[in-house]
Amino acid sequence: MTFPRYILGIDTSCDDTGVGVVELAPDGSVQVRANRVWSQTVHAQYGGVLPELASREHVERIDTVTGDALAEAGLTVGDLAAVAATSGPGLVGALLVGLMYGKGLAQALNVPFYAAHHLEGHIFAAASEADLQAPYLALVVSGGHTHLFDVPREGEYVLVGATRDDAAGEAFDKVARLAGLGYPGGPAISEAARRGDPEAVPFKEPLQGQKGFDFSFSGLKTAALLAHRAGAKPEDLAAGFERAAVRFLVGTTLRAARAYGRETVVVSGGVAANRALREAFAASPVRAVFPGKGLNTDNGAMIALAGAAAIRAGRAPSPLSEGAVAYAPLASV
């Protein structure tokens, strides 16, 4: 089978303008050739992402980031054989920028266009890095998502558990903000936690005794707020919160791995960069696979990888009428 060689991927689902290029070899193997991300620092002053502002920033940056990605790959736009872009889930206005840009580029080049699911992109960011074959569990944990999937076969996704309230990354952001540690909260919490004492601010494990594999972070947020009001040191608060969140994520995932008989867990999304989370999984009985450098947070290379997977699986290109969707369950394809 002859595959399109160079695939461009675009992700504008939130506040990062990501464009990447992968090379799909005749044997089906795939290699990331470029991955460029423009992170919108303007949102830091607001303590969170402003959707309309994010959309405007994408419009201003996407052409430049695309050019940078092509230059990094040593290619011209005419070398592209397919284009993939995130269609959801995410901020609709932001998604539309990348989606319309990708469609227009594919149409101008007369090459196939593939609408990609943001969560599938995160999964492939780790799975492709290790040339991993199903079956495995996939934990996608980021600022907007906390989902646990069983992946019995490539392209088949069974939702095992999900957050009942906040996503893990969102909880990190909110706790960091109330403790005055800055934004984004993930790196801020991780850095402060190194200087803190987790025993100084104890947190109870959420959803104790549950038979399923769901997540919840509202209780940890409330406990952090109460500790802050009681005068807890920011670094101790960060240490206690991080330890509780990591134990909860890892413990729930390990229970699911035992229940589904999986020995390998893919861990992806922005929170996957957390040092404590990686160390906890490394010490666990499962094989934990994480994305490579630059592929944890939102990026275009992971969408190009999802496009490559669609091509290898023989999926038909997406219609140019494909729209952006804010909420899109990851269905088996």
Swiss-Prot record:
One of its GO terms (molecular function) is N(6)-L-threonylcarbamoyladenine synthase activity. Fe cation binds at H118, H122, D298. The keyword Metal-binding applies. Keywords: Acyltransferase, Cytoplasm, Iron, Metal-binding, Transferase, tRNA processing. Binds 1 Fe(2+) ion per subunit. It catalyses: L-threonylcarbamoyladenylate + adenosine(37) in tRNA = N(6)-L-threonylcarbamoyladenosine(37) in tRNA + AMP + H(+). GO terms for cellular component: cytoplasm. It holds the Pfam family TsaD. It is an enzyme of class 2 (transferase). Its EC number is 2.3.1.234. Substrate binds at V140, V141, S142, G143, G144, D173, G186, N274. GO terms for biological process: tRNA threonylcarbamoyladenosine modification. Its cofactor is Fe(2+). It is found in: Cytoplasm. Required for the formation of a threonylcarbamoyl group on adenosine at position 37 (t(6)A37) in tRNAs that read codons beginning with adenine. Is involved in the transfer of the threonylcarbamoyl moiety of threonylcarbamoyl-AMP (TC-AMP) to the N6 group of A37, together with TsaE and TsaB. TsaD likely plays a direct catalytic role in this reaction. Belongs to the KAE1 / TsaD family. PANTHER family: TRNA N6-ADENOSINE THREONYLCARBAMOYLTRANSFERASE, TRNA N6-ADENOSINE THREONYLCARBAMOYLTRANSFERASE, MITOCHONDRIAL. This is tRNA N6-adenosine threonylcarbamoyltransferase.
